[in-house]
Structure formats: C-alpha cells, structure tokens
Amino acid sequence: MVDTLACNTPSFTKLNLVSFAHLRQFEVADCSFVYVKEVRMIGLKWLESVVIGENCFTMKDSRSQLHLKDCERLRELRIGNHSFEYNPSWVIVNLPSLEEIEVGEWRENDYRSESALIVKSKRLIMRLTTRPAQLEIVVVR
C-alpha cells in the first residue's frame, strides 16, 4: 500500500508498474502521486485489485493518460473522488475477470454523486464515452 501524501515529488510524472510482474494488489491512500500524468499497468497477469484513494493523480495536463490493459486476473477497479479528475484519457482494455468498476463515491439522495460510476457484474461489457472531458473507458471481454 502506498501511504497518504506519498510520491508527490514534482519530477515524478510517470508511473509504470510493468516491471512488477507478480503484483497482486495496488492500493494507494489519499492525496498521493499528485504530479503523475501517465500511469501504466499493462500485462500484470497476477494483478487482482486496484484501489486508488481520493485526490490522487490530479495533475492538470491535457496529455495525461491511464492505461490498464491485459491484466487477466483483475477483478476490481476502485477510484476515489477526484482521483484522475483531470486525466482526459483512460484506456481500460482486455480485463477478462473484471467484475466491478467504481469511480467516485455514490451516495443515495446526494446531488454531488452525479459524477460517480459504479458497475458490478459477473460479465462486464461496457463502453462509456463522455465527450466534454474526452474521457473514454473501454472494457472488452
């Protein structure tokens, strides 16, 4: 687990987890990686869970990217409020075991929850495109 307020050095702008071949869980506490504008989790065949706290990966840059691809055992993806908020490109592809995606926090009868996304399914096939922010999430099974 990455602690709260960790990895916030301005020169640390890319996070590539490809070399962590046996990573099973990636968990980040709140307010971490604030200067990172590119995240790559590709080909991590043992990865089962990605949980990101609030206000992480908040760098404002039109070239920011999140790549989550080819992780055959990944079951859950949870991203806290305001994390990746300014990240215009999300590529989430080829995750055959994915059962749950949660982005933001949804509270019943709370108007601030309108930006939350929660998808739970045994068989998840989804394409979501939100053009104003040019956010794209693609999960193909």
Language-model features, listed with the residues they occupy:
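Acidic/polar low-complexity surface segments
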Residues: 52-67, 105-120
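Small-residue (G/S/T/A) turn/hinge positions that recur once per unit in extracellular repeat modules
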Residues: 6-8, 32, 56, 83, ...
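LRR N-terminal entry segment and analogous cap-like coil->beta motifs
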Residues: 1-36, 44-47
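Core domains of intracellular innate-immunity/apoptotic signalosomes
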Residues: 83-84, 91
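Right-handed parallel beta-helix
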Residues: 46-53, 73-80, 97-105
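Conserved hydrophobic position(s) of the canonical leucine-rich repeat
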Residues: 12, 23, 33-36, 47, ...
